From Swiss-Prot:
Protein name: Minor capsid protein L2
Disulfide bond listed as a keyword: yes
Disulfide bonds: 21-27
GO annotation, biological process: microtubule-dependent intracellular transport of viral material towards nucleus; symbiont entry into host cell; viral penetration into host nucleus
Posttranslational modification: Highly phosphorylated.
GO CC field: host cell; host cell endosome; host cell Golgi apparatus; host cell nucleus; viral capsid
Annotated compartments: Virion; Host nucleus; Host early endosome; Host Golgi apparatus
Subunit and interaction comment: Interacts with major capsid protein L1. Interacts with E2; this interaction inhibits E2 transcriptional activity but not the DNA replication function E2. Interacts with host GADD45GIP1. Interacts with host HSPA8; this interaction is required for L2 nuclear translocation. Interacts with host importins KPNB2 and KPNB3. Forms a complex with importin alpha2-beta1 heterodimers via interaction with the importin alpha2 adapter. Interacts with host DYNLT1; this interaction is essential for virus intracellular transport during entry.
Amino acid sequence: MRHKRSTRRKRASATQLYQTCKATGTCPPDVIPKVEGSTIADQILKYGSLGVFFGGLGIGTGSGSGGRTGYVPIGTDPPTAAIPLQPIRPPVTVDTVGPLDSSIVSLIEETSFIEAGAPAPSIPTPSGFDVTTSADTTPAIINVSSVGESSIQTISTHLNPTFTEPSVLHPPAPAEASGHFIFSSPTVSTQSYENIPMDTFVVSTDSSNVTSSTPIPGSRPVARLGLYSRNTQQVKVVDPAFLTSPHKLITYDNPAFESFDPEDTLQFQHSDISPAPDPDFLDIIALHRPAITSRRHTVRFSRVGQKATLKTRSGKQIGARIHYYQDLSPIVPLDHTVPNEQYELQPLHDTSTSSYSINDGLYDVYADDVDNVHTPMQHSYSTFATTRTSNVSIPLNTGFDTPVMSGPDIPSPLFPTSSPFVPISPFFPFDTIVVDGADFVLHPSYFILRRRRKRFPYFFTDVRVAA
């Protein structure tokens, strides 16, 4: 039989033990100092507080919350909320009511009548007019001041040649002052101006090697784009849509939204469902403005893209920096070009056997009128005689009747033939040409097919067994 384990009883607290053992003197040594507050820590606080005051800090054996107001920095006061003061109003007079006064307020005494409508007009009484006449015999005297000598006012104009070009100076317009016109001199003298020589600034370039009229740039360094750094991946784009509409390579075009501007930086937001049309532009969230540069004698169209491969919990996106480029056209340096390149022309006929002459003098050639009636011509043939091939007749006419145009008479050269000419019509090739071939030779061992063993499925243990 299994014995039941006795449960552990909880010990009485120090306060409960102190109430029972104090009178009998059987208290443990740690009960009386803890209840009476005579422990070592209490004695340190008791005697140490005589020399140091920590009352404002709230240090004690309590919960450590800093007291009622909490912990505050030394030398500062806790924030207090200002209580708004209400404006003082005059007291309200309360009418006293006696015990014998009536509590019913009479409405007839306090009722006032309001007159509606406009007031009645007052009718004036008929009366005459009072006319008063008076006559004054004193003559009118006008005070006229004597006219003295007229004063002449002068206006002077000063021209500063430092701020005005002398070649465009014009005499000022006449000014009017007090009825007198004052004219300036009609001409401008050039002797009063100073001729300042122009200085040439120091230019850090060789004027003999200048090939264009492009202004000389300053000494300000050109900012590097950083397209070919180690941290930038290089991707070549072949699709021509990269030049005009690069957004079609990243996301699908939606005509319901506003179109993208290819000259600005493009921002994209991808979803996890639809991939990019071009796999090279996968996870691209930003495609910066285009830049046209020259790289190894080519005009290169470049754009820098930013990928968002990873995304942290805080929302920060991490991805690679890719340089997309497409070469437009090559640039040939000046050293590789030939300014006056001449080509040697080979004669079409042998000039040693031909004997003809052309008049070295000047002759006039008059064009005849175009004949409306075209004379049909027979097909002309040219013969080429060689030792390796047979004579072949090739028609040179296009099939249409060509009008005969008159001109200077130039005899055609005559060529001797090594073999008699036999015209053949129609023309067919004499030899049979068979075009057949392959780029590999199959080994003879592959022509023999191997015999395969037949397999019969016996489903004893769900495994096929070879017979």
